[in-house]
Amino acid sequence: MVKKALVTAIAAATFASNAFADTIVKHTTLNTEVGDLAANVYLPDNVENPPVVVVTGAWTTVKEQMPATYAEHLAEQGYAAVTFDFRGWGESKDKLKQLEDPQRKIADIKAVFASLDQVDGIDASQAYGLGVCASSGYMLDAVLGNEDVVAAAAVAPWLHDRSVVNAVYGGAESVANLVQSGLRALTSDEPQIIEGASLTNQSALMYNVPYYTEKDRGLIPEWDNAFNVGSWAGWLTYDAHATAAQQDKPILLVASEAMAIPAGTHGYLDKAGDNVEAVWLENVSQFDFYDVEKDVQAATDAVVTHFQSNL
């Protein structure tokens, strides 16, 4: 097995934080091969044609949640950042709503990279990707073999394969039942939508889960707070490890043993080549990675160091 380089958080956090204090945020619509996608562009002030990072977030989320948090931190360090709403989420309209479909989302990310030439004031030839949580796998698949992308990173990676899925979702039989419910929902006459997160509704996708149920964190007006039951079919059968051995981009995984599924990151590293490295931060939970300042800053510092080494 090819040995993986493990970069320490201290060594990674060498780039000066908050080097560019002022950020300009512009709302735009990208006309892409998958349709119109609502996007926000974060531009560091007084930086001419900066490199650009496409930032994506956790499952069910919109561009104003943790993607915005990381976009702001990247802009403070001299990078432009583009966040966007996937088809059927937030401001990006589609007949299929709130569907967590990995293959659709991978296609959306690829389409955004291919449309960066529509964004003024950036250097689209220096494009990078950053996926947070569930979209880590989507981002890694979207950049594989993609000539529009230089390098990519993932923060709080949710990189599941079949074994991780079975462990998280109650075993093989439970997973099979959820997949079948998803398939039935996809073929039903009406979309089957449930609440995304709640402190009172035990049938919600994420009952009593931090961040998503907190108004000063992820429970914001822009968020759909909804989940299409049909999502189970694609989400639970998606294998983020399937392409690890073929990954051809310089990749950094910013992880912690305290996050949701560290086993998924270890498994991906075991299958990938030396171009995939990891930073392991101490005692950072999944939700801390989303918006706790010291943890977001440490993760951003590591990501920026990685991108700078691949300019």
Feature locations, PLM:
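N-terminal cap/lid segment of alpha/beta-hydrolase-fold proteins
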Residues: 22-48
